[in-house]
């Protein structure tokens, strides 16, 4: 059924930079499929705004870093959410799309759905890894979920939640064969000799907890692997300043710190030591052997352990359904253990070939033209609503 010729209005909310990137990608796909007169508004960042999005509030008002900071921001976040819900109920857009940020968006989505406004959520929370009870909230709040990973629709289907697998945008963005030589030239690194990328995280708390351990591991690796060089991306000047005392404490390290360009840094590497997170998927798509690690405060770790379901935390292992790369977490993440595991990943050529095969298959599975698939799913929801009207 064709969509109405009257002006379409879609409300959207992205709460952090990664959501802004996904939202902009979705908007690009929607603009190719919906009438030019369609309007898009809500909360988004600069990438969404560049796609013609009208952001009524600043996205960084929703971006929280750490529990202490979050407590201070709660009143402002609740105020914005209340105003947004009142606006939605008054203006009744054709659909509401929440981009990630589930703690903020599910509440808005439930209000929209209860009012007869279709609610769509982009990025399924990791209910398959921990806090599985959130599936009940999803079932109450979401009409249609756009999933990044292929195993998620089956989980949602059991709870009666309609969904579409749209693939992961990183798989569309990253080439199937990484240009390691070109990345080394771009960073001024030698063409020959081993290079290890080290990524200790992007938050102050992450650097404080695992940064010293990663630097101690680098010092051990340099002793055991003569000629090895390290590259470490710093996403912001503030992060670089946070790393500087650790750099000063290890003046003999053959370390290059880059301003951002984390993907280039990983592409240049032969192996990667990385803090758990989405960046581990990026490393897999770049076909790199890696060691995954993290350290969190003891109480946080206990909560995560009790609410978790899988024996692994890294996305490459989760997607493979087994351990394909080592994980050293919490008290197991000692400098000695990290150095041993990373050097093994660096030196084992047979393992490198096996991982390349595994990660290539993973890459092809996730490469779905996410912007187009997500936009097509949204259009179908709009058509279904029109059919019921």
Curated annotation (Swiss-Prot):
InterPro entries listed in its UniProt record: Glyco_trans_19
Molecular functions per Gene Ontology: lipid-A-disaccharide synthase activity; phospholipid binding
Family annotation (Pfam families): LpxB
Keywords from the named record: Glycosyltransferase, Lipid A biosynthesis, Lipid biosynthesis, Lipid metabolism, Transferase
Disulfide bonds listed in the record: none
Pathway: Bacterial outer membrane biogenesis; LPS lipid A biosynthesis
Glycosyltransferase among keywords: yes
Keyword Nucleotide-binding: no
EC number: 2.4.1.182
GO biological process: lipid A biosynthetic process
One GO cellular component, as annotated: membrane
Catalysed conversion reaction: a lipid X + a UDP-2-N,3-O-bis[(3R)-3-hydroxyacyl]-alpha-D-glucosamine = a lipid A disaccharide + UDP + H(+)
HAMAP family linked to this entry: LpxB
Family statement: Belongs to the LpxB family.
Protein function: Condensation of UDP-2,3-diacylglucosamine and 2,3-diacylglucosamine-1-phosphate to form lipid A disaccharide, a precursor of lipid A, a phosphorylated glycolipid that anchors the lipopolysaccharide to the outer membrane of the cell.
Protein name per UniProt: Lipid-A-disaccharide synthase
Species, as recorded: Burkholderia lata (strain ATCC 17760 / DSM 23089 / LMG 22485 / NCIMB 9086 / R18194 / 383)
